[in-house]
Curated annotation (Swiss-Prot):
Essential cell division protein. Residues 43-67 are extracellular. GO terms for cellular component: plasma membrane. Residues 1-21 are cytoplasmic. The keyword Cell cycle applies. It comes from the Bacteria. This is Cell division protein FtsL. Belongs to the FtsL family.
Length: 67
């Protein structure tokens, strides 16, 4: 008797395409949303750091009597 082999990645891909379109769409949406949150937080932290640098420069100028 010959052992029958199945191509598991192909079966999983076909199942996703036939039965899991909504799940696949939601998975992509979740990954995209998480990526956008990370990018937004990163950019916000950069802006906060930049703002703190500007405030420190203003304080130094005030302490030196330049303003």
């Amino acid at each position: 008797m010959k052992i029958q082999r199945y191509d598991l990645p192909k079966i999983i891909k076909n199942d996703f395409l036939l039965y899991g379109k909504i799940h696949l769409t939601l998975l992509i949406a979740i990954i995209l949303s998480a990526s956008l949150v990370i990018i937004t937080v990163y950019n916000t932290r950069l802006l906060i750091t930049e703002e703190e640098d500007v405030i420190q420069k203003k304080k130094k100028k005030m302490m030196n009597g330049e303003i």
